[in-house]
Each structure stands twice: as structure tokens, then as C-alpha cells.
């Protein structure tokens, strides 16, 4: 034993190790016992271009937010990690970030990697969400190992989302945080999760256009441009015209001002920030519990039948698949009375998930500081769940965070679709539409227009006024492909409605009557 200690900690051994460490440092290498690269010169070369973040994790070069929508970003594990855990995280802008972590990494380790990658400061409002084998969504617990929480994987797929919707968006200090909130709300509205009235939807869509495109310039921008964006499900042409008219009223707003106006408008929606959970009552009927910053909403179908404010809830407990709420209410004489409500869920796992979400919402929005008091009872005889809220509250997030002097980020453009005129033109002209999609707009996502089964996709329509139509003559070199000289596209000079009659007649002939097409210089008639 003494021989081992002298060999390891003796003066000569320490001097020899110091000389070796100095040589490795000059060569840009490191000892794996110190967290240096493993695998020889190749590993050292690959890690030399990746600056290490605090904690020994390796991040992409640059360190700041790499908002490359739709791209894939890889974050390597630290050099000392032998076994790695592979996780895929999808950000709000569409970026997929793959992270390698140690085998026994906790949720906090993965969350720290993501917020460091994004250069996000106000992290308390966000979380990582995943689906279990029963397709039930769960929030990743930062205090527990990832492998113990996620049973589907590897690779483990998670989504970076807003977990706590701020009750007052003006308290969000950073512009980047407000931008992420806008992305989350746009996704909620487009997916149908967040319902909003018609007028509110028009205003929110107009603010999105102002933030992304800037001023509405009438010669350049038309109502047809609005149809290239998607704001709500089942978007109509009449709504797009109203959005365009409202867009013109927001002249002068910067992107940051437009996004703040968006949040201040969206916060008044009835279902803003509501986390819905399906339960069953004592009568066996299905209800929905909505967790909000002010309390718990009760829905029967689409009708709101009750609201339990957080200060009125004195007890919230669960046992197996049964959730119990004790609420204090004033009777007609002003005396307080306790009412007990019992709800049942499909399984004990979903019941505990609802209870945890309710505890987290109550602690985040109602408390100034989380209660860290430990029970006097021994852990050996302790009953119930060990879960305790360990994050920061909204009060701490708004009063304790320090504002940065400067921060820069990139706003990603929205997904664009062909305009309505383009889609209508494509339905009647398959060849020209294919040329438009491949040449004029290579990155525009295609519609699925109404298709006529009796017309070959590569065969252009033959028109009476143009007997020799070919693939080459449809799109000439001296003018864009979208220009068309057919008579029914031109406005009638008389203005007596003959133009409309001609269009109806041509459409009827094309759909029901006989027409001719040319294919490889051969005239074919299809009945």
C-alpha cells in the first residue's frame, strides 16, 4: 500500500505527470482523466473546433443560437463519457437538435444543453415534453434520470415548448423570449388547440405579417399574398382579404412591437395557456380540467361550468387513479363551507401526471418562492408521492433575472404555400403548375388540387384558339410561365358579363364535353 502511494503521489511521480500534462497542453491535447479527448489525435482534432461549455459539455462552434429552421444540429457528449444517451429535441422553429449525454444523465442536463444552444436566459417558462407508450404527453422531470422517465427509445424524442404561459407578457424582458411565445401561440392556433374569435384571429394574423414582412406596400403586396400563409384551420379567402386590410393599419410597428401586441391580444383569449386534462366525474360523465394561472377550470364538453381559484383549493391529493379536490366556498350567509370533488382518470400514471401538473402550476403562479421544507418523518415510513416543485416561480423569474445589454437572434420565415390563384391555375393546367413549382418557386410546398383523372399529368390542354400547343410553347423564354394569353383569361372589353359566360362555357366543355390534347406532336381526342 505504501509502495502504491509513493509511486502515485511521490515527488518524482508528480513532477513527471506535470511535465507530461504541460506537453499535452502545448500540443492541444488533454488527459482523459481531466475530461480531455479520447481516441488519440483524431478525437483531439474533432474536438478542437468545438468550444467546451461550462460543465464539460461540447457545443457547436459559435455557442450562440443556431436557429436553422428544418436543419439538424448535433451536440456531442463530453470527452470523459463512456456510454452515451442519444436524444432528439425538436425546437419551436423546426430545428432538430440531437444531443449525446452520459448514460445516467438527468433531465436537467438535457435542458441545460438546449437552453445553452438557444442562448435563452428566461428559461423558467419552458420545458421538454415527450409521449409515453400510451401516447400521453409528459413533461420531463429535471430531477430524475432520463432513462427512468422515458420508456420509448432510444433515440429519445422530445419537444421544446412553452410550459407556463405568462399571465402578463409585458413581464417577459427579452425580445427572444417573446418571439418564442409567439411561435408557440401560432402553433396552438393553427393546430386548433387554442380557439379564437374571427376578429381576434384577423388581428393576430395581421400582426404576424407585420412582424415578418414589415410594412404593407400596396404596389408590391396584394391580398393574394396572404393566401401563402397559414394562420388558422380552414382559412377562407374572405378572411385573407380582411387580414390584408388590417395589416395596412399596423404601419410603423417594428417586429418586436408587433410581437408584443400579438401577445397582449392573445392573453385575453379564454383558453390562453390552459393545460387541458380529460377526467370522469362521480356520475361517470366525461369532463375536462384546465390548469390556468388563476386556478382550475371545469368543462363539460365545450361549456365552462366552474372555476376553482387557487386560494380556494385547500387540498389536492390523489390515490391510484382517483384525484380529490377540496374547495372552500362561501354560502349564502357568508360562512365558509368545504366541498369535495372526486375525479377519476384512466390509469394511476395519468392521475399522478395531472396532480404533478396542478402542483407545478400552483407553485409557479401563486408562490413567491418554492417551499423547500423537509418533512420531519423518515423517508422509510413516508407515504404518498415524493414529488416537490423545485424550479423558480413566476415572481422569481420576473424580479430576480438580470437583463442582458444586447442579444441578437434570427427570426425564421414562415412556411409558404402557393397562392390561391396559383392553386386554381394548377388545377386546370397540370403541366404549367409543375413548371411553376420546379422553376419559379423551388421551395414552395405544393398544393393537392382537384385532379381530372381523364387527363394525363404531362399532357397540356388543347384550346380551340391554339391548335398546335406543345410543351415548349406553353412557357416561352421571353415571358414568365404564369402569363397566359388564352381568351378566357382576358377581361371583356364591353364589360357586359360576356367574359363570365365564356368562362362558364369553357369550364363546362372541359369537364363534361369532348376536348382534344396534344402529346408528342400527336393529336388525341378524349371523350
From Swiss-Prot:
Gene name of the record: Epb41l4b
Entry-linked PANTHER family: 4.1 G PROTEIN (PTHR23280), BAND 4.1-LIKE PROTEIN 4B (PTHR23280:SF18)
CDD domains: FERM_B-lobe (cd14473), FERM_C_NBL4_NBL5 (cd13186), FERM_F1_EPB41L4B (cd17204)
Highest taxon in the source lineage: Eukaryota
Lineage, highest ranks first: Eukaryota, Metazoa, Chordata, Craniata, Vertebrata
Subunit structure: Interacts (via FERM domain) with ARHGEF18 (via C-terminus); the interaction activates ARHGEF18.
Post-translational modification: May be negatively regulated by phosphorylation.
Subcellular location: Cytoplasm; Cell junction, Tight junction
Protein name: Band 4.1-like protein 4B
Molecular function GO terms recorded: cytoskeletal protein binding
Keyword vocabulary terms for this entry: Cell junction, Cytoplasm, Phosphoprotein, Tight junction
Natural source organism: Mus musculus (Mouse)
Region (Disordered): 23-47, 400-425, 453-482
Compositionally biased tracts (Basic residues): 413-424
One GO-annotated biological process of the protein: actomyosin structure organization
A Pfam family this chain is assigned to: FERM_C
Amino acid at each position: 500500500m505504501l509502495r502504491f502511494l509513493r509511486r502515485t503521489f511521490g515527488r518524482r511521480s508528480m513532477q513527471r505527470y506535470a511535465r507530461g500534462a504541460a506537453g499535452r497542453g502545448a500540443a492541444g491535447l488533454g488527459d482523459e482523466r481531466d475530461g480531455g479527448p479520447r481516441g488519440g489525435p483524431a478525437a483531439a482534432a474533432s474536438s478542437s473546433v468545438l468550444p467546451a461549455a461550462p460543465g464539460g459539455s461540447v457545443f457547436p462552434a459559435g455557442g450562440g443560437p443556431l436557429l436553422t429552421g428544418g436543419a439538424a444540429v448535433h451536440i456531442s457528449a463530453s470527452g470523459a463519457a463512456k456510454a452515451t444517451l442519444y436524444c432528439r429535441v425538436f425546437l419551436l422553429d423546426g430545428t432538430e437538435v440531437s444531443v449525446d449525454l452520459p448514460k445516467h444523465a438527468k433531465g436537467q442536463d438535457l435542458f441545460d444543453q438546449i437552453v445553452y444552444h438557444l442562448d435563452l436566459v428566461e428559461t423558467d417558462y419552458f420545458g421538454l415534453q415527450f409521449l409515453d407508450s400510451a401516447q400521453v404527453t409528459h413533461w420531463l422531470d429535471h430531477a430524475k434520470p432520463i432513462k427512468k422517465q422515458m420508456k420509448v427509445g432510444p433515440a429519445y424524442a422530445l419537444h421544446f415548448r412553452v410550459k407556463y404561459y405568462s399571465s402578463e407578457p409585458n413581464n417577459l424582458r427579452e425580445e427572444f423570449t417573446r418571439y418564442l411565445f409567439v411561435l408557440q401561440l401560432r402553433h396552438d392556433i393553427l393546430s386548433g388547440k387554442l380557439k379564437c374569435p374571427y376578429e381576434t384571429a384577423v388581428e393576430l394574423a395581421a400582426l404576424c405579417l407585420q412582424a415578418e414582412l414589415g410594412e404593407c406596400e400596396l404596389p408590391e403586396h396584394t391580398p393574394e399574398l396572404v393566401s401563402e400563409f397559414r394562420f388558422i384551420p380552414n382559412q377562407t379567402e374572405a378572411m385573407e382579404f380582411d387580414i390584408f386590410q388590417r395589416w395596412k393599419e399596423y404601419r410603423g410597428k417594428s417586429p418586436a412591437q408587433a410581437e408584443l401586441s400579438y401577445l397582449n391580444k392573445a392573453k385575453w383569449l379564454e383558453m390562453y395557456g390552459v393545460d387541458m386534462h380529460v377526467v370522469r366525474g362521480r356520475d361517470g360523465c366525461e369532463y375536462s380540467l384546465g390548469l390556468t394561472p388563476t386556478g382550475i377550470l371545469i368543462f363539460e364538453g365545450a361549456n365552462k361550468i366552474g372555476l376553482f381559484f387557487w386560494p380556494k383549493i385547500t387540498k389536492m391529493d390523489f390515490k391510484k387513479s382517483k384525484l380529490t379536490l377540496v374547495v372552500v366556498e362561501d354560502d349564502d350567509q357568508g360562512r365558509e363551507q368545504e366541498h369535495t370533488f372526486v375525479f377519476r382518470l384512466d390509469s394511476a400514471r395519468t392521475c399522478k401526471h395531472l396532480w404533478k401538473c396542478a402542483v407545478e402550476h400552483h407553485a409557479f403562479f401563486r408562490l413567491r418562492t418554492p417551499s423547500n421544507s423537509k418533512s420531519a418523518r423518515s423517508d422509510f415510513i413516508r407515504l404518498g408521492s415524493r414529488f416537490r416543485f423545485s424550479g423558480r416561480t413566476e415572481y422569481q423569474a420576473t424580479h430576480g433575472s438580470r437583463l442582458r445589454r444586447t442579444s441578437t437572434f434570427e427570426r425564421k420565415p414562415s412556411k409558404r404555400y402557393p397562392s390561391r390563384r396559383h392553386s386554381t391555375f394548377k388545377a386546370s393546367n397540370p403541366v404549367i403548375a409543375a413548371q411553376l413549382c420546379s422553376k419559379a418557386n423551388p421551395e414552395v410546398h405544393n398544393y393537392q388540387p382537384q385532379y381530372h383523372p381523364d387527363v394525363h399529368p404531362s399532357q397540356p390542354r388543347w384550346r380551340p384558339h391554339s391548335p398546335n400547343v406543345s410543351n415548349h410553347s406553353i412557357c416561352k423564354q421571353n415571358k414568365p410561365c404564369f402569363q397566359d394569353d388564352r381568351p378566357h383569361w382576358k377581361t371583356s372589353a364591353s364589360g357586359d358579363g360576356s367574359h363570365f359566360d365564356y368562362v362558364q362555357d369553357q369550364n363546362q366543355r372541359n369537364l363534361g364535353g369532348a376536348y382534344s390534347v396534344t402529346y408528342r406532336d400527336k393529336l388525341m381526342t378524349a371523350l
